[in-house]
C-alpha cells in the first residue's frame, strides 16, 4: 500500500462464510442437541408462562427475545427507551484476477473513526479532521473499507451506512463507486469485476454496542446495536446466559 505509515495485524483472526455457516450451525444444533427450529413462525407476544405465536402457545420457563431489525415488533415496548433506529449498508462481491490471494482481511483508516473502540480515543479527532478533507464523500456516506476473500476467491467489499426510520430498498451507484475507489486505493488489484451487489439493514443506537434488557427474571431482550453481531454473537450469548441466575 503506497503511502501507508502503519498497520495493525491480529494473528488470531478467524472468519467463516456466513452463507454456509448459518444453515450448518442450525443443522448441528438440531442434530447434536435436539434443538427445534420453528421456521417462518412469527412470535406475537411474550406471556407469563412462555410465548404466543401465530400458531399457538409455547410453554417456556425462560425466553430470550432477539428482535434483530424488528424494532416495532414484540420487543418494541422494551426497546423504546433507547431510541434505536435502522442503518442501511451497501456491499459488493468482486472477482479479482486469477491467482490473486489476500492473506488477511483488510480494513482502512475510515474504520478508526467509526468503531467506538477507536473513535472514542482522543487521537481520532485529528484523524477525522484529516479524513474530512481527504475522504469527505466517504464519511458523508458512512463508508469504511472492509475487504475479505471468500473460499471461491472472490472478495467481499464494503460498506456504507445510511440511517433511517424505514430504509428504502434502493442502492446508490455513486456509493458503490466510492467503495470501489477505496478498494483500489488500498489493495493492489490490477482489475476486478463486480459479480454481486446487495443492501443490508441493522439496528443502531443506545448506550453501548449491544443491549441486554431484563424486563423480569425469566425474560431477556438481546440486540446488537453496532453492526458487530457476526463478530461478537457467541461471546455476547455466553455473557447473557452466564449472568442469568
Model-inferred region functions:
Residues 39-58:
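Conserved beta-strand-loop-beta-strand element in the redox core of flavoprotein oxidoreductases
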Residues 101-111, 135, 143-156:
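Conserved FAD-binding catalytic core of PHBH/FMO-like flavoproteins
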Residues 118-150, 182-185:
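FAD cofactor-binding and catalytic pocket of flavoenzymes
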Residues 81-84, 135-138, 146, 201-202:
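Short Gly/Pro-enriched turn/cap motifs at secondary-structure boundaries
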Residues 142-144, 150-156, 162-245:
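C-terminal catalytic lobe of FAD-dependent flavoproteins
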Residues 57-122:
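Central helical "cap/lid" subdomain
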Residues 17, 21-25, 39-42, 63, ...:
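Internal, well-ordered alpha-helical segments in soluble enzyme and binding-protein domains
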Residues 1-38, 45-46:
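Flavin (FAD/FMN) cofactor-binding and adjacent substrate-gating region
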